[in-house]
């Protein structure tokens, strides 16, 4: 049986077979330019990620899932606005092109983090045997969205986890220590493409992390995501028994999913705080990549 000790996350260029297939579907279904660290970490455990993805994907194709992520995103912005702007940008000497690139990078993570949070809440509900409401009996059709990465989305490029630059390496070490994380998340590694900017926002964010209002806001985001996940259209056929049958330790899978469910509200909140320096809250509360409304007769969310 595959234990769940820390393993090397599977990079996008390392993926083959079923993992390559799932990575492609993640990019297309979540409408994102790359695969984030939490999903790449799960890919290290053989059949786990394909089974998890296939169980979740019917819901992830739906407008209901997109709307749920939009609601989490708007709540994160409201919480960030109450905490207050970081005011970290002034005096950095960034050029116009750098300003635009940073804003685009923030849009990428501001879009995907709420989706990952709802996805993780849904996975835990199914895995824990929690009831996920089904609307099959209440609606003749489930509204789906078009797949595909938005053409204006920033590529998910990032600095290596072990950077050569000693200042960036020290910054990553501080982020890991402060957040008690075994690795630096994709968000920070992308922002490290502009190390002066990351250093500035991290120095402003770090003292906020210890504030009670920050913890309450993060807990509230997690509660919202779980409540919204309960009302997604399709049940999640991924039980502890099925995971065990795959040869993966179910208890440690649950521990990792719980870890992600604690982490992702804070990532969503942090990116909202970063982005408030660039964009007013009213605009930031709207999806940076809204989707067209389309309606299909759906069977399990598949097309």
Language model regions located:
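Hydrophobic alpha-helical segments
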Residues: 1-303
């Amino acid at each position: 049986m595959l234990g769940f000790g820390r393993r090397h996350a599977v990079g996008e260029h390392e993926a083959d077979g079923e993992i390559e297939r799932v990575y492609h579907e993640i990019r297309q279904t979540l409408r994102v330019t790359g695969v984030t660290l939490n999903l790449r970490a799960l890919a290290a455990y053989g059949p786990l990620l394909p089974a998890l993805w296939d169980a979740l994907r019917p819901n992830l194709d739906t407008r209901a899932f997109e709307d749920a992520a939009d609601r989490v995103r708007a709540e994160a912005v409201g919480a960030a606005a109450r905490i207050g702007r970081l005011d970290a940008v002034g005096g950095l000497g960034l050029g116009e092109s750098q300003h635009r690139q940073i804003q685009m990078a923030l849009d990428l993570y501001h879009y995907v983090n709420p989706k990952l949070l709802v996805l993780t809440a849904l996975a835990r509900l199914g895995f824990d045997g929690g009831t996920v409401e089904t609307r099959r009996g209440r609606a003749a059709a489930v509204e789906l969205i078009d797949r595909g990465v938005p053409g204006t989305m920033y590529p998910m490029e990032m600095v290596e986890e072990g950077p050569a630059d000693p200042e960036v390496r020290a910054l990553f070490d501080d982020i890991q220590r402060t957040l008690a994380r075994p690795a630096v998340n994709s968000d920070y590694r992308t922002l490290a493409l502009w190390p002066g900017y990351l250093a500035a926002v991290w120095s402003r964010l770090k003292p906020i992390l210890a504030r009670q209002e920050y913890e309450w806001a993060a807990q509230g985001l997690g509660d919202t995501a779980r409540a919204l996940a309960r009302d997604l259209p399709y049940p999640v056929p991924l039980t502890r028994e099925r995971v065990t049958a795959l040869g993966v330790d179910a208890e440690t899978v649950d521990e990792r999913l719980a870890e992600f469910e604690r982490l992702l509200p804070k990532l969503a909140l942090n990116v909202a705080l970063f982005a408030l320096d660039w964009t007013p809250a009213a605009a930031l509360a709207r999806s940076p990549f809204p989707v067209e409304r389309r309606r299909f007769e759906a069977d399990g969310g598949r097309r």
